[in-house]
Structure formats: C-alpha cells, structure tokens
C-alpha cells in the first residue's frame, strides 16, 4: 500500500479567484436569493435583522475585505508551497459538481472517475456570458487557460469502484465525462489543479459527491463512511507511491456562519466522528453542503496517524 503523505482541505469559492473590489458583484444575487442559515431559510433583509448584533458592516468595509483577501491568498500560498515541498506522486480528490458536467437529467450521489485522461477545458464564451456576475470573473482561478489533459489512474479507479461495491456502495463509475460536456473537470477539482498544484498536475482520481442538489444528497454519516471505504481501497492497492488526499469545498456559504465553521474545524482536529456524522442534512445545504467532502476525507483518515 502507498503512503498517505499529505492531506488538505480547502474552500474553492469565487472570492479566492477575484479581487476584494469584485466581491460586491455578488450583491444582486445575494439580495434576490433565499439563503439557508442555521436550519432556517431567509431572505437578505431578514438575515440583516437577524444578525444585526454581529457588527458585520465593519467586516464588510473595503479595507476589511482587502485584509481578508490577503489572508486567503497567504493561506493558499502556504498550501501550494507545502504541496511542492511534499511532492506527492498521485492524488485522491473529494469534490462536487454544480451542474458543470451533471444536471437534472442525471446527478449521481457518488461517482468515481477512472478514465485514463482527465479533460480540463477553459471557460467557453457561452459559459462566461451565462454565469452570474462575480462567478464569470472567477473562472480563471479554476478553469484551464487552454484545453489540457491530465493523467488519471485507471487501475486505482477501478479498484476503488470494486471496493465500494463490495462494501455496499452503489457507486457510479465514469470512464469519460457525460456526452456533450465541454467543461471537463468541475471547479472543485480545477481549483486544486490550478491553485494548489500550480498547473503541475499529478495523476489523480476525481471522486464526486452530490453535496448540493436535492433530492439525492448523501447524509454526513454516509459521506464519512464513503471516505472510510475509499481508504480501504487505497490500503489494499499495491504501490510505493506517495499519496495526497484533498477535500475541496465549503466552508459555510452563501451565508457565512463563522461559529459553525470553527466548531466544524475543532471536530476535525479532535477526530470527533459523532459530531461530524450527526450534522443534519438541513444544515448541509447550498455551499455549506460541500463540507461533506471534508467529512469524507475525515473518514478516509480515521485510522491514519497525523
């Protein structure tokens, strides 16, 4: 079996790929949309009233946002530098899709990609025009600047799939992207390729989970057990390669709940399986749902020394 040389979790939101000055481009959508927050669903004005004692206005000044953007950039640089220092041979990436390659016609709860090549497309002009303000501007942070192909790991992918099936996961297997898809790897994976690997992409296995869209979102408990089972496959795969594992997505958004984020990170640190797997599905909605990729990675690392 290979050595788990590195484990990382990261958000991949558009704020990481845009300037602080561009963050306000999301305001019209924020005003229009309904937002899950602490098991309820609210409009923008109701959230302002509900959270008026938190001094959020002070944290939304341009000066404060620039400082926050700088901290984010420093954190991403630290991650990329650590990646380069460890220099893993291959990677396992837990992520999700947001109607980039899957849609309402087919949206698997779990999918393992086992193709020989992983297509990574630049954002098309159609995609840029149809994307909401603040999203189109972020495309360069995760979409390839030109068409690229990265190496998959077909034998490992097949082994993961067969192990999952053996342990009662009815997982979707994908040897190529759905017909007609011109997006290739979803932004959860493109963020890792571009921002952490800095475009020097090692052979990897993209593992998809439908965190986002009802009605077939896996529970936190199922996400944890899924990651744990993927680790069983890695442990029984014969290799001497250094392996990295990623959880891509989160944290709470679009309504930020820093108290929950900190509690979640604390649970990860103390390996509190009970806390992580007990988070109700109604809490893990919208962008916050992507934390299930982190929960899968926690299951993956359950018996791993760190």
Feature roles, as predicted:
Residues 89-95, 207, 241-249:
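Beta-strand elements within well-structured catalytic alpha/beta cores of enzymes
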Residues 1-88, 108-228, 233-236, 256-306:
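Flexible, D/E/H-enriched segments
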Residues 248, 254-255:
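A structural signal for small-residue-enriched, beta-sheet-centric alpha/beta enzyme cores
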Residues 12-14, 95-98:
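Short glycine-rich, polar/acidic loop-and-turn segments at beta strand-coil junctions
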């Amino acid at each position: 079996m290979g050595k788990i040389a590195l484990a990382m979790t990261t958000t991949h939101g558009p704020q990481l790929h845009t300037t602080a000055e561009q963050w306000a481009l999301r305001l019209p959508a924020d005003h229009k949309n309904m937002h899950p927050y602490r098991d309820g669903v609210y409009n923008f004005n109701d959230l302002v009233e509900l959270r008026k004692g938190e001094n959020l206005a002070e944290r939304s000044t341009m000066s404060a946002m620039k400082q926050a953007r700088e901290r984010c950039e420093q954190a991403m640089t630290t991650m990329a530098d650590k990646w380069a220092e460890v220099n893993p041979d291959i990677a396992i990436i837990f992520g999700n899709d947001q109607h980039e390659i899957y849609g309402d016609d087919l949206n698997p709860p779990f999918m393992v990609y086992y193709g020989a090549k992983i297509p990574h497309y630049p954002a098309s002009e159609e995609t840029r025009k149809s994307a909401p303000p603040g999203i189109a501007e972020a495309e360069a942070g995760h979409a390839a600047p030109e068409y690229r192909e990265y190496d998959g790991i077909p034998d490992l992918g097949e082994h993961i799939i067969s192990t999952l099936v053996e342990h009662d996961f009815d997982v979707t297997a994908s040897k190529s992207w759905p017909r007609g898809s011109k997006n290739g790897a979803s932004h959860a994976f493109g963020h890792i390729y571009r921002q952490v690997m800095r475009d020097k992409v090692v052979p990897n296995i993209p593992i998809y989970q439908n965190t986002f869209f009802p009605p077939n979102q896996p529970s936190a408990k199922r996400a944890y057990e899924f990651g744990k089972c993927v680790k069983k496959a890695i442990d029984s795969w014969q290799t001497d390669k250094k392996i990295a594992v990623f959880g891509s997505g989160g944290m709470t958004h679009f309504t930020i709940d820093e108290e929950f984020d900190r509690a979640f990170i604390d649970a990860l640190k103390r390996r509190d399986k009970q806390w992580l797997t007990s988070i109700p599905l109604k809490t893990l909605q919208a962008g916050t749902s992507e934390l299930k990729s982190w929960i899968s990675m926690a299951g993956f690392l359950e018996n791993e020394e760190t």
